[in-house]
Amino acid sequence: MSGNAALNRPLGGFDATMAGIGSIVGAGVFVVFPAAVAADGGGLAVPLLIAAVVAYACGVSIFQVSAALDADQANYDDGGTRAARLLLGPTAAFVTGWVFLCSRLAASAVAALMLGTYLLPDFAVPVAVGAVVLTAVLNIFGITRSDWVSRFIVAFVIAVLAFVAVAAFNSGHPPGSVKLATLPEPGLAGILESAALLYFAFIGYGYLASLGPHVRSPARNIPLALPAALAVVLGLYLLVGQSLLSYFGAPALAAEAAPVLGPVSQVSGSIGTGAVLIAAAAAGLGVLSALNAGCARVASAMSDEGELPSVFGRTRAALKGRPETHWAGITAGAAVVVVLVAAFPPGTLLGVAAFFGLLYAGATAVTAFSLRSRRWYTPRVLNLLGLAGALLLALSLPLLVISLGLMAIVAGAVVRLTFRRGR
């Protein structure tokens, strides 16, 4: 979930696939496997496959919605909101935008706590808060990563994950005594909950699906790049997940807070541990920066439509010579993430992020279903599959997660009634 908001040159099919892989592989892979194993009792292959299928179906919907917009409107951050307004009306647009904001704010909190848990587990919350503040300040000053830096980080993270998998398959078991979790009996409900949580690790697929204006021949390249990227990431996740299961065993993996560290802890000279920590920090900071800026852009678009206070639509340069940024949205988003980090444990935040990510995917599928013009590879049945899959997985999450999600939606309704302009 760490793609750049803009690209400097049109991409071919291979480059688009690589950009998609980079946007998907992020902070989620460092934290999602313990929660997924705890949900279904141990298996990862079937839930991962379900999550990937739902991601593909919903990705096609995002591609359709993006293709229906003008080039300057077809972006990942607020493209779904703009399309919903054009096709379904202002209420649908607000719901889509609000759900997007909730999803990305919760995902930011997960990424921040992941970073803190890996770097300084005894001070995870303070480190997470510091990371949120740091990335917000950088965004306010308009300091972003170049394309080549982003690609290097993605390549490094993937290489580290592959190294972890090899180390896990070739190691014994964790040294000393380990904490064991009590696992549920395997069943359909557990598989669906596990798939919903694992979906969080695929959420960045939407960035690739909305890359149309930045890709040569998007009608040909994106429908090929999307399944290719998801297939590569699915293979990577299967490799890493199965290797962690082999190393820890299901009960120990379910209780592990920083699972990717375990298999490399015995590598001589702490080289493996250092590489994992650097990868976790790079992935976490990259996700925080991208999501913070993305939420600010969505808030700005909603403000322009009169759905949020006008302050979110204003831009200002922090210093003379620096680019103008959506300072209010960046600041407000960071403040919300800090509250989430301080108030909720990582597992709850992961569930909430997955819940809202699935709701956003479902909302986009509804928007795509309403489109009349479509190609042979975007049938309405695929939109229905995405909608049904997203709702089924969302409702399979724990009652606490669903309750928190519904409370946030009610809060959104209050915000709209209070601040809506131009009625």
Predicted regions and their residues:
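Small-residue-rich segments of transmembrane alpha-helices in multi-pass membrane proteins
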Residues: 19-28, 87, 154-168, 228-237, ...
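Helix-loop-helix junctions that connect adjacent transmembrane segments
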Residues: 2-8, 45, 49, 126, ...
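Membrane-interface "cap" regions at the ends of multi-pass membrane proteins
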Residues: 1-34, 38-43, 55-56, 60, ...
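Transmembrane helix-loop junctions in multi-pass membrane proteins
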Residues: 29-33, 111-112, 138-144, 271-272, ...
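Hydrophobic transmembrane alpha-helices that form the core helical bundles
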Residues: 56-132, 137-140, 280-301, 339-363
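Membrane-interface loop-to-helix entry segments
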Residues: 116-119, 123-174, 185-186, 226-230, ...
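TM-loop-TM module centered on a large, flexible mid-protein loop between adjacent transmembrane helices
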Residues: 78-89, 227-291, 308-346
